[in-house]
Amino acid sequence: MTSFSDPAAVSGYAERTEQLVPGLHHLHRMAGLLLAERAATDAHVLVLGAGGGMELSVLSQMQPDWRFLGVDPSAAMLDLARTRLGEAASRVEFHEGYIDSAPDGPFDAAICLLTLHFLPEPGRLKTLRAIADRLKPGAPFVAAHYSFPTEG
């Protein structure tokens, strides 16, 4: 059982993440502001690592006409996102899986916050390329990466 399929881990995800990442809500707002500078008011936004729904919640409140594709490999985390979003979940298409099996788009914008560290290093570049391939030309992309020290 992975941590994202363990019911106790899933239920405490938001609280733990907010403790581990000071200013998390500000990161979500800043990412939304950056996307809004270039994305249309009716944008279709790709959200990679959407499980939990934290950034989807902030983005959907900031931009009431945006629609989203939320991609996450964990069904339990996507269920958590649906619950967190309430009525705003109607503006989200949820995709259980990884980016390579997600719809092609094209999307008006994309966001990937604190997700890449869950992937092995070789998979990170592949994931970033898959996101870029799904964006319209010139579309904004905001990423934030959580890095851990490595022993050498």
Language model region names:
Residues 44-46, 52-101:
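Class I SAM-dependent methyltransferase SAM/SAH-binding core
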Residues 1-12:
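N-terminal, positively charged/glycine-rich alpha-helical extensions of SAM-dependent methyltransferases
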Residues 23-41:
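Conserved alpha-helix/loop element of class I SAM-dependent methyltransferases that forms part
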Residues 138-145:
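Conserved beta-strand signature within the Rossmann-like core of class I S-adenosyl-L-methionine
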